[in-house]
Structures are given as structure tokens and as C-alpha cells.
Amino acid sequence: MRRIFILNLFFLISFMHFNSAFSISPDVFIQSTVNRASQVLSENITREEKINQLKIIAKETVDIKGVGFYSLGAARKALNDQQKYTYSNLFENYFLKSFSSRLAEYTNPEIEVKDKQILNSNYTIVNSVLIATNERPEVKIDWRVYTKNPDNP
């Protein structure tokens, strides 16, 4: 189960992206996103409300379509436009449900951004750690952030 969670987390973080209109660096973007999710999870609201708010955060920050097509691999080339459209919609629904319901189980997760490595003008790896608690071990998380406009990060 832990392996599946880490694999899903890898796919999520591998395709994080942000709009250049934010004009913030990738590490600040990640910390901001993490803080938003943590705030939702620590609120005294129903699980359903947490799930709905986490879905909004995911839609704003994750390239869900990119994750879906990456998951298809070479099979993507065999699909026609209608099949790609249908798949994208189904994958988005699956991703949002899986991501938000799994994350909603956490209460006040603390993720600390440690470092960043600029790979090129468009990609940055942001290193962070999910702080250990009595219930879960420390988990290292590397986020691959895509900057659409390197001149205005």
C-alpha cells in the first residue's frame, strides 16, 4: 500500500506546474501549494468539504492531463482524438477522486521544502520532506516543476 501511495505521489509531483502569472520561484510555489493543502486538512470541516477543496487545489496546480497521457505511454499514439478526450475526462475524475480522498485522511501534514535544483530554464526539482509523526515515517518528496515562461517564473 505504501509503495502504491509513493508511486501515485511521484506521478503527482512529477507533473506539478504553475502559471507564469504567479511570478514566483518553483520552491516558493511548492511551499505555497503545500501550505494551502495543509490548511485545508487542519480545518474543522467535514471530510467531503476537505475533498472538494483539495480537488480545487489539484486542478489549479497539477497537470492532470499530462500525468494521464504519461501514464498511457506509447499507447497514447494509437488513440484517436475522441478516445483521447474521453480518456482525459475519465483520468481526471479518477485522479481527483483518488488524490483527494487519500490526502483527506491526513490531518495537518507538515512538508518542509529543503532545496531546489534548476535542471534547465523550464524544469526545476524541488526537494522536500514530509515530516515524520508517530503514525507515519518521514517521506522524501521531489517535485518536478515546469515553468511555462522562464523569463517570468
Summary of predicted features, one role per range:
Residues S25-L103:
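Early exported N-terminus immediately downstream of N-terminal targeting peptides
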Residues A21-S23:
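Boundary at the C-terminal end of the N-terminal hydrophobic targeting segment
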Residues M1-I4:
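Positively charged n-region of N-terminal signal peptides that target proteins for export
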Residues K97-D142:
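Surface-exposed, charged secondary-structure patches
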